[in-house]
Amino acid sequence: MIMKRILTKLAVVLIAVSAPAMASSQALEGRWANAKRSVIVKVSRCGDAYCGTISWASAHNREKGTTPGTRVLSDLKPAGDGVYKGRAFEPKRDISGSATVRQVGPDVMIVKGCAVMGLFCKEQRWTRIS
């Protein structure tokens, strides 16, 4: 009887601990717009990680090289506390570097890309669009 109570409590704790992790990883998937709403990126599973591909760009951004179908985030893997780390690509400048994506709410994430050994970084606030 005591063993059954212990196992039940352990199961409840494990479910409580794993539920937020599952919810946050699923929440990363979707369509996200930059602050100017000039680019929309679709984030989805890519094997054992996440990636982000441009699904729409304004005419101005397309002229500058930001074209739909371009992968701008890759190999994003959980790093804890709603943070994902991977790679970023900036198509306007043709630069790749490290990426950190931090979910600050169900519909808001901060995307930071750094290049040249972390010397040059750019951070943007993206919002989920339905």
Give each language-model segment a name.
Residues S55-A57, C114, I129:
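Predominantly extracellular/luminal cell-surface or secreted proteins
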